């Protein structure tokens, strides 16, 4: 039975994570994977070329070495491994799964700050630092989503937590209390 891309990503990312951790190169490999993901996004033909069964292996190896020169030996070995087993078609999923393992290991969380207006970088940083400290994260990476219907305040979505500090919700709570107290 063939493995799904998610299963492939899970297995290969765990293998890469363990390999990098054992070599004490986890941060370096993580950096390499982020660079590789960016290169793949900017050059979608790269993954098609490395996944194409018609293109000879030695041509793929030459192409791979043309952009992997700055990577750690662990990353290069892993990329050669993917090439050998024909798994480059799942590279982006593997990197995302590896990233999740890395973030979990380093106690890094990511989430969304929903606000009525666009937040600048300083505001996002202050919010993420306060939330990270309060909930025990080493680091929290927030993106901003604008939703004018919340009227004001902020709704934080981090993992399975939602902290609703919006004016809209507060007004609804006041309304419900007024109705109850009639």
From Swiss-Prot:
Gene3D superfamilies: N-terminal domain of the delta subunit of the F1F0-ATP synthase. One of its GO terms (molecular function) is proton-transporting ATP synthase activity, rotational mechanism. Pfam families: OSCP. GO terms for cellular component: plasma membrane; proton-transporting ATP synthase complex. Transmembrane segments: none annotated. It comes from the Bacteria. It is a peripheral membrane protein. InterPro entries: ATP_synth_OSCP/delta_N_sf, ATPase_OSCP/d_CS, ATPase_OSCP/dsu. It is found in: Cell membrane. Keywords: ATP synthesis, Cell membrane, CF(1), Hydrogen ion transport, Ion transport, Membrane, Transport. Belongs to the ATPase delta chain family. F-type ATPases have 2 components, F(1) - the catalytic core - and F(0) - the membrane proton channel. F(1) has five subunits: alpha(3), beta(3), gamma(1), delta(1), epsilon(1). F(0) has three main subunits: a(1), b(2) and c(10-14). The alpha and beta chains form an alternating ring which encloses part of the gamma chain. F(1) is attached to F(0) by a central stalk formed by the gamma and epsilon chains, while a peripheral stalk is formed by the delta and b chains. F(1)F(0) ATP synthase produces ATP from ADP in the presence of a proton or sodium gradient. F-type ATPases consist of two structural domains, F(1) containing the extramembraneous catalytic core and F(0) containing the membrane proton channel, linked together by a central stalk and a peripheral stalk. During catalysis, ATP synthesis in the catalytic domain of F(1) is coupled via a rotary mechanism of the central stalk subunits to proton translocation. This protein is part of the stalk that links CF(0) to CF(1). It either transmits conformational changes from CF(0) to CF(1) or is implicated in proton conduction. This is ATP synthase subunit delta. The gene is atpH.
């Amino acid at each position: 039975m063939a493995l799904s891309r998610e299963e492939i990503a899970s297995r290969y990312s765990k293998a890469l994570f363990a390999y990098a951790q054992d070599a004490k190169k986890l941060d370096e490999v993580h950096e390499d994977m982020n660079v590789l993901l960016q290169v793949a996004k900017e050059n979608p033909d790269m993954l098609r070329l490395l996944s194409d069964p018609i293109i000879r292996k030695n041509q793929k190896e030459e192409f791979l070495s043309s952009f992997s020169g700055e990577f750690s030996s662990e990353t290069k070995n892993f990329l050669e491994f993917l090439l050998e087993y024909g798994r480059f078609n799942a590279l982006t999923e593997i990197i995302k799964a590896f990233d999740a393992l890395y973030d979990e290991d380093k106690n890094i969380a990511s989430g969304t700050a929903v606000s009525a207006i666009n937040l600048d970088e300083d505001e996002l940083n202050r919010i993420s630092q306060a939330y990270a400290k309060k909930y025990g994260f080493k680091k929290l990476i927030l993106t901003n989503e604008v939703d004018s219907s919340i009227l004001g305040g902020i709704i934080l979505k981090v993992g399975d937590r939602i902290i609703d500090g919006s004016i809209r919700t507060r007004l609804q709570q006041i309304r419900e209390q007024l109705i109850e107290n009639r």
